[in-house]
Amino acid sequence: MQVAAIFIDAEIEDQAQELRKFFKKLGAEISEDKSSKGIEDDLHKIIGVCDVCFKDPSLHTVEEIDAVLNSVVSIIVSIPLERGENLILAFCEKMTKAPDQKLAQVCLQSLWRLFSNLELTSPLRYHVYYHLVQVAKQVDQVKEVFTGVEQLKNQFTQCPPSNEQMQKLYRLLHDVLKDTNSELASKVMIELLGTYTAENASYAREDAMKCIVTALADPNTFLLDPLLSLKPVRFLEGELIHDLLSVFVSEKLPAYLQFYQNHKEFVNSQGLNHEQNIKKMRLLSFMQLAESNPEMTFAQLQDELQIGENDVEPFIIEVLKTKLVRARMDQKARKVHISSTMHRTFGRPQWQQLRDLLHAWKANLTLVQENMKSVAEAQIELTRKQ
């Protein structure tokens, strides 16, 4: 996200007095006179009434309000860090109170200016960013301030937030992303669970359940096996949500249908869509079949996936679109030929398979190298004889 840089051609004391006059004219309970206690007290009182400009937007243009808030931010960043914490927190809180989207957009820009102009080593950047995400949600611009977990971590490399602060931020990000970007929301929840240790994993029950539900509901998340290794998820072993996750990790469609038949109310109570679950389980079942069957007939797929004869080809096309499986469809022979597939689980057998494959490649490369060496030696010998 980019906004204009802060540049106010006036002394901060003069700016503060102009702001006092401006807010006074709007009806705010504030004196026009400078505070005898200094600029920090001026700023404290200005921030306390700055939201008065939100009450009747018709009195001023959005651009004018933006300029006023820009002036407030320019004073805030001039205050020494050790004395500015309460001022920054108060300003951030005011910026979340915009009554409509146009003003919320102005507040978003003001918070971004503040965030961008704080020292990279300032611990207050975390608090500004947290409120920034809240306001971005209001104007549907979360993607402008958050693009991924790595980008987030990079922003705080010089002053990392505490573990508890990151957990709070991850929960907020999940909440604002879950309805618009389920894939990214799922990644955020997995990152959140990764912040728990063996000592406190038992307290992450709610987060773990949200993480599982988000991953199951996301139509683009198919590799679910890593969730089972997360400590908070392990504490759910024996509970229905963990049993359901295990079905999605390694079982086929019939196992899910049986689970749903036995626990229909539970599945629905988690906000999961049964039809979407079936669709996902069919795809996961196909992947599992593809691991051990380089060739499958349409009839076999009909039986295994419980789909109609006319639905087989459209289903295969949908599978190929995910790029999880590479295959060729033979419509005449009514077969599908598998080239490769992503494994649903990656445990010891898969590591062994990968080891064997790499050893085979190594042996083949060694053979090629020896053959090339023999050809080169023969060529040299032939040249000598000539």
Swiss-Prot record:
Role played: Component of the eukaryotic translation initiation factor 3 (eIF-3) complex, which is involved in protein synthesis of a specialized repertoire of mRNAs and, together with other initiation factors, stimulates binding of mRNA and methionyl-tRNAi to the 40S ribosome. The eIF-3 complex specifically targets and initiates translation of a subset of mRNAs involved in cell proliferation.
Keywords (A to Z) from UniProt: Cytoplasm, Initiation factor, Protein biosynthesis
Signal sequence interval, chain numbering: none
Protein's UniProt name: Eukaryotic translation initiation factor 3 subunit M
Principal subcellular localization: cytoplasm
SMART domains to which the protein is assigned, alphabetical: PINT (SM00088)
Annotated InterPro entries: ARM-type_fold (IPR016024), COPS7/eIF3m (IPR045237), eIF3m (IPR027528), eIF3m_C_helix (IPR040750), PCI_dom (IPR000717)
Any matching Pfam family: eIF3m_C_helix
Subcellular location: Cytoplasm
Keyword Protein biosynthesis on entry: yes
Organism of origin: Culex quinquefasciatus (Southern house mosquito)
PCI domain mapped to chain residues: 181-343
